[in-house]
A protein has these predicted regions:
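Extracellular glycan-recognition regions
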Residues: 1-202
Length: 202
């Protein structure tokens, strides 16, 4: 079933179909992850995990930004997250997460995978939501977060080329340690622009 989201191209799942709904009047996209699902290519060589599924669209070839306000409305469990995701294949992907840490803190977490995952904790989030943004700059990508959707804090810049398929960019919920995770995305915006300065808050 196609899920049209205002302002975005047609969306499809990267893996198996997931649970999603869109409230057009509120501009809210809701994804619900099953228990035990995640994306992870263990840097220590352990088993990979690709049971989560992202709802996304073919990334524009030119520079762009995709942003959304994110929150998790279900009871929080370790490593659950609302995610902006970038995916080519299971060895080439990245995700920008509003994640719940083992210490019981909500925080921004970034993961970049080129065969193996490079995982990095970022800002602690004290509120119930956070704005996330992915920006394309040629073959490079930038991750930002914001408490208000106006001033953006730089999180990560990385170079990553696709694997066997072109990039898809979109939304995901994950619940690697819990029974489920419901993630809500609103204030969704796709802008065809290039960020001129990654560190000036714009």
């Amino acid at each position: 079933m196609l899920i049209p989201v205002a302002g975005l191209p047609e969306l499809s799942w990267t893996h198996k179909p997931g649970a999603a709904s869109y409230d057009a009047s509120a501009g809210e996209l809701t994804l619900t992850a099953a228990g035990g699902v995640d994306w992870s290519n263990d840097a220590l060589g352990g088993p990979s995990q690709h049971e989560a599924t992202s709802l996304g669209f073919d990334a524009p070839g030119d520079d762009f930004t995709l942003s959304a306000r994110t929150r998790v409305t279900s009871a929080r469990t370790t490593f659950d997250a609302a995610v902006l995701a970038l995916h080519s294949d299971d060895d080439h992907w990245a995700k920008l997460c509003f994640e719940y840490s083992p210490a019981g803190q909500a925080m921004v977490v970034t993961v970049v995978t080129d065969r193996f995952s490079d995982d990095c904790n970022s800002a602690v989030v004290t509120g119930t939501d956070v704005h996330l943004r992915i920006a394309r700059l040629g073959d490079a990508w930038a991750f930002h977060s914001s408490t208000d959707g106006v001033r953006w804090d730089f999180g990560r810049l990385f170079h990553l080329v696709p694997g066997g398929a072109r990039w898809k960019v979109g939304f995901m919920a994950q619940a690697p340690m819990g029974d489920s995770c419901t993630a809500v995305f609103d204030r969704i915006a796709l802008r065809h622009e290039r960020l001129s300065d990654l560190r000036n808050g714009a």
